[in-house]
């Protein structure tokens, strides 16, 4: 007997394998999106530090103002904040993103803002 085509078992096995491969690919894509949101928040916080340094060079102090009379600074679409707090010897700032529940922070000076623990290095949780 000469058969053409595939048996039901063969088709079922191929479908299961394809389902596994697709589920792995979707999970990796979701992780990549989360990492992208965190990277944009960290980049925005580094840019904030740069803007604060430029501002303090002219005015000899840091500021919480963004825009007219304050920092020349723009936030990436999707990022929220920054919330800037002046400290005795610098400032601390935090930022969120509308697509994730994680937040990132950075500080300059001696007053850390968790999750940041190293001065000038943004950290997220």
Residue ranges and their predicted role:
Residues 10, 39, 119-120:
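Compositionally biased non-globular segments, especially hydrophobic aliphatic-rich helices
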Residues 15, 42, 49:
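Conserved catalytic core of two-component sensor histidine kinases
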Residues 28-45:
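Aliphatic-rich helix starts adjacent to a transmembrane/signal segment
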Residues 50-125:
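Periplasmic/extracellular, small/polar-rich flexible segments of pilin-like filament-forming proteins
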């Amino acid at each position: 007997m000469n058969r053409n085509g595939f048996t039901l078992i063969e088709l079922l096995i191929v479908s299961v394998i394809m389902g596994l491969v697709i589920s792995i690919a979707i999970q990796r894509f979701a992780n990549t999106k989360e990492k992208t949101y965190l990277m944009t928040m960290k980049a925005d916080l580094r840019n904030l530090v740069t803007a604060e340094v430029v501002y303090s060079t002219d005015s000899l102090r840091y500021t919480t103002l963004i825009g007219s009379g304050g920092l020349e600074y723009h936030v990436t679409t999707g990022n929220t904040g920054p919330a800037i707090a002046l400290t005795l010897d610098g400032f601390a700032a935090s930022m969120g993103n509308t697509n994730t529940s994680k937040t990132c922070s950075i500080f300059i000076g001696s007053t850390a803002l968790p999750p940041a623990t190293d001065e000038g290095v943004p950290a997220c949780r």
